[in-house]
Amino acid sequence: MAPQVWRRRTLERCLTEVGKATGRPECFLTIQEGLASKFTSLTKVLYDFNKILENGRIHGSPLQKLVIENFDDEQIWQQLELQNEPILQYFQNAVSETINDEDISLLPESEEQEREEDGSEIEADDKEDLEDLEEEEVSDMGNDDPEMGERAENSSKSDLRKSPVFSDEDSDLDFDISKLEQQSKVQNKGQGKPREKSIVDDKFFKLSEMEAYLENIEKEEERKDDNDEEEEDIDFFEDIDSDEDEGGLFGSKKLKSGKSSRNLKYKDFFDPVESDEDITNVHDDELDSNKEDDEIAEEEAEELSISETDEDDDLQENEDNKQHKESLKRVTFALPDDAETEDTGVLNVKKNSDEVKSSFEKRQEKMNEKIASLEKELLEKKPWQLQGEVTAQKRPENSLLEETLHFDHAVRMAPVITEETTLQLEDIIKQRIRDQAWDDVVRKEKPKEDAYEYKKRLTLDHEKSKLSLAEIYEQEYIKLNQQKTAEEENPEHVEIQKMMDSLFLKLDALSNFHFIPKPPVPEIKVVSNLPAITMEEVAPVSVSDAALLAPEEIKEKNKAGDIKTAAEKTATDKKRERRKKKYQKRMKIKEKEKRRKLLEKSSVDQAGKYSKTVASEKLKQLTKTGKASFIKDEGKDKALKSSQAFFSKLQDQVKMQINDAKKTEKKKKKRQDISVHKLKL
């Protein structure tokens, strides 16, 4: 008892843990590390528990315990697979053995007894039917083959054994679905009407089916004879009102007449197999085949024209073909009568609308559709590649990296190597070998001493010079005098050397292909406005230096920069111009004031026009006459409402007092000062 209690407790504990975890499934939306560790420990418990209870027959994993420590999820899964794969194989083999054993049943004993009773009743009924059949066969066949009855009886008994009766309750207990389907098929066959078996019957041929088929053919021939008798009464010389009457006449013939051997199909020999997929496929084909309907309509028109001239038999065959085509086009749905009539009405309306349209109308429809699609393409927003000049702000980010760009390289292209060029080169080389002209290109070497080497020789010494300033000047003076004495040469020789150098330079420029221009003379002299190209390039003497100058060298750049139009000016440029105008205005006012003061000093009569006294007198005269009026400050006597106004007024008064006091002090000082010129003798 103790081990059983222990087993039950371990399983109950595992179930409670799993129940707690699955009780709140919303927790699994986030990562639950605690639950994960708990589940791994549960798997270990169950694995170890299973290993303890294993029999000797079941050989699972060789590991007696599941190892979890320092193992990741994949390694734990691999340990479980080692255990599960052989056990699953063992159970599959065991189940297949039990299924093959017919004596084993999953039903309870009470139901088995009921099934046996039902089976015995069915066997009794079937025995009676078999006896009746045997008597009929004996009466029909005589003593030809007495063993056939016994064979039939044995086969029926074996069928009854194989087909036990199943109830609705049994379906919940039996799990072999394929076996159930086979047994139900056998039952259905047994329930059908038993047919008479003959000696000729085998797996493919049955005499009873052939007799039934012949009887059906005889009945159809009798119907044909009746129809022929009715057709003899029809007057073929009677006038026909319209095509509809003709169609109705021949339609009756089609319905009554049988099909020819050329038009027989699978459904004429075997029962039709109906399925929803076939119906939907036919419906889709009908809706998607407008062009095919037009072609079929044209073929029908041709057939009608041919049928008027052909004989009656040919006409009947053409009508049968048309009937077959129409039957293919028809779609039948398992709907009630009202719904069926509505659907057929809608389909007929669509067909009629399609049939009414002429070829010109169809062409116009296609053309209109094409025009609409082209207009839509033209009106839609074009991609940035087709919008002309596009800046980086207008196109999407990193879109230029996906494009292959074509741009020109300003580089001289290498000559194309052809047969002609190679032959020319070979001829030149051969000719030089014949002439023994081995004068290879002279190797040019860079001069060891740079032209501006003197710049490198100047060393900067950060230490304070120990020499005095007088000593430094003395040394510089001595160096200059020594150089002058050392460099004294014959002036005629110097002149001849200069002339020869200039001549050889011009001759080299004209004759030598690999000409190196004369390097610049190292002079500590800044030459302004000298074109840089003169010393690096050999140009003809007739060309002036002005043609080689850059635009900036011809005309100096404005300090403010390039001249801009009003549209090109920025906010800073506009502000700069405004400040400049204000400054000029201020300067004009200052100059005007200076001129006025000079006039006052020089001549009082001329300056009287602009003096303050004259202006004040004129104002008084104007006020007396009434032409002008003074604007008085009437707000002085009024009381101040705010503290800010009071303190501002007080501050102004104090400033005025301070300024008056300073002026008086300056006047006193001026009076006290005595000039030196007055004290001169």
Swiss-Prot record:
GO biological process entries: maturation of SSU-rRNA; ribosomal small subunit biogenesis; RNA processing; RNA splicing; RNA splicing, via transesterification reactions
Alphabetical UniProt keywords: Acetylation, Chromosome, Coiled coil, Isopeptide bond, Nucleus, Phosphoprotein, Ribonucleoprotein, Ribosome biogenesis, rRNA processing, Ubl conjugation
Output compositional bias ranges, type Acidic residues: 105-147, 227-247, 291-318
N6-acetyllysine modified-residue sites: K609
| Superkingdom of the source species | Eukaryota
- Report biased composition (Polar residues) as residue ranges: 180-190
> Annotated cross-link Glycyl lysine isopeptide (Lys-Gly) (interchain with G-Cter in SUMO2) - which positions?
K350, K382, K394, K555, K632, K649
Question: Oligomeric state and partners?
Answer: Part of the small subunit (SSU) processome, composed of more than 70 proteins and the RNA chaperone small nucleolar RNA (snoRNA) U3. Component of a heterotrimeric complex containing IMP3, IMP4 and MPHOSPH10. Interacts with IMP3 and IMP4.
**Molecular function per GO:** RNA binding
Coiled-coil residues are 109-138, 205-239, 284-324, 348-382, 469-490, 574-604, 648-670
Region listing for Disordered, in residue ranges: 105-202, 216-364, 558-606, 660-681
Q: Which parts of the sequence carry Phosphoserine?
A: S61, S120, S139, S163, S167, S171, S242, S275, S289
Q: How is it modified after translation?
A: Phosphorylated in M (mitotic) phase.
InterPro entries, per the entry:
Mpp10
What is its subcellular localisation? Nucleus, Nucleolus; Chromosome
Q: Where is the composition biased (Basic and acidic residues)?
A: 148-162, 193-202, 216-226, 280-290, 319-329, 351-364, 558-575, 672-681
Protein name, please? U3 small nucleolar ribonucleoprotein protein MPP10
Pfam name, any one: Mpp10
Q: Spell out the Basic residues composition-biased ranges.
A: 253-264, 576-598
GO CC annotation: what is one?
sno(s)RNA-containing ribonucleoprotein complex
| Gene behind this protein | MPHOSPH10
The primary site where this protein sits is: nucleus
Functionally, this protein is described as follows: Component of the 60-80S U3 small nucleolar ribonucleoprotein (U3 snoRNP). Required for the early cleavages during pre-18S ribosomal RNA processing. Part of the small subunit (SSU) processome, first precursor of the small eukaryotic ribosomal subunit. During the assembly of the SSU processome in the nucleolus, many ribosome biogenesis factors, an RNA chaperone and ribosomal proteins associate with the nascent pre-rRNA and work in concert to generate RNA folding, modifications, rearrangements and cleavage as well as targeted degradation of pre-ribosomal RNA by the RNA exosome.
